[in-house]
């Protein structure tokens, strides 16, 4: 890999870290439920809403990426993510959190769709699989940090500036701004798209291929396990063992710690 590609890989890996911001929705929904005294059904709207936008925006994002390029699409996703992280700093009302989590889901849908192709552009065919797996390792670091940051903020173990558990939003906001600036300032040469871009229906028709359909179902199950563990693990410990939310928050981090180790190990195998 050339020196230029190595320099471009740093902001791309930081974008993977920003991709992990979406996993804060699990612990955040538990804290919002506790603060606003919501029912389980009402609180579960938050994680469902975040990942609902994957269904809506994944295919259109691919079409957008063909028009404006991979790097610009990732930058758009980062800007939307920054707005989603900024809103909770100003309050914790139900409506505000709905808008924040919706923007977080939209930004992450754009990022998930465009970041992997950007890695392919940077790597130019070299160690692509292991680089993607290492990127998932970086993403998982952000995922397991979120519950600890929220817990430390709620317990005032770190300066929370009156935000309590919501201090994780400005912390991730600063990292997101850094990722945006680094990616914007890093020159990445993208090859021009040859031929006609695929239409919406042509993209959906790929599900008619068994391997694509099975991969789609596998990813859906994987995301379901992620979201389910992320959201319900603290609830189960609170209900069965009588733990407080601050004490039970470690369950989500424990899951992501082992996922982080798995991604790191996988990057070496690949």
Explain the meaning of each model-derived region:
Residues 25-26, 208-263:
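Extracytoplasmic gate region of multi-pass secondary transporters
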Residues 7-40, 116, 229-234:
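Extracytoplasmic
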Residues 126, 131-187:
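Helix-loop-helix hairpin linking two adjacent transmembrane segments in secondary transporters
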Residues 100-137:
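Cytoplasmic helix-loop-helix junction between adjacent transmembrane helices
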């Amino acid at each position: 890999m050339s020196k230029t590609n190595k320099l471009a890989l740093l902001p791309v890996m930081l974008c993977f870290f920003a991709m992990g911001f979406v996993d804060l929705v699990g612990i955040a929904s538990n804290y919002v439920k506790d603060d606003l005294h919501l029912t389980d059904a009402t609180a579960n709207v938050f994680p469902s809403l975040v990942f609902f936008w994957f269904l809506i925006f994944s295919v259109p994002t691919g079409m957008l990426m063909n028009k404006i390029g991979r790097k610009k699409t990732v930058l758009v996703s980062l800007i939307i993510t920054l707005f989603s992280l900024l809103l909770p700093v100003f309050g914790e009302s139900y409506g505000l959190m709905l808008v924040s989590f919706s923007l977080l889901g939209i930004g992450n849908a754009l990022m998930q769709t465009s970041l992997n192709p950007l890695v392919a552009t940077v790597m130019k065919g070299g160690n692509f699989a292991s680089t993607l797996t290492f990127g998932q390792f970086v993403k998982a670091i952000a995922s397991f940090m979120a519950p600890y940051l929220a817990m430390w903020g709620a317990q005032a173990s770190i300066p929370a500036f009156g935000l309590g558990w919501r201090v994780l939003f400005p912390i991730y906001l600063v990292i997101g701004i850094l990722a945006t600036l680094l990616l914007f300032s890093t020159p990445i040469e993208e090859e021009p798209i040859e031929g006609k871009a695929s239409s919406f229906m042509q993209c959906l028709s790929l599900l008619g291929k068994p391997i694509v359909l099975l991969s789609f179902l596998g990813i859906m199950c994987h995301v379901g396990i992620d979201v389910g563990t992320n959201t319900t693990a603290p609830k189960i410990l609170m209900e069965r063992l009588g733990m407080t939310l601050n004490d039970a928050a470690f369950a989500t981090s424990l899951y992501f710690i082992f996922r982080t180790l798995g991604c790191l190990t996988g990057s070496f195998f690949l």
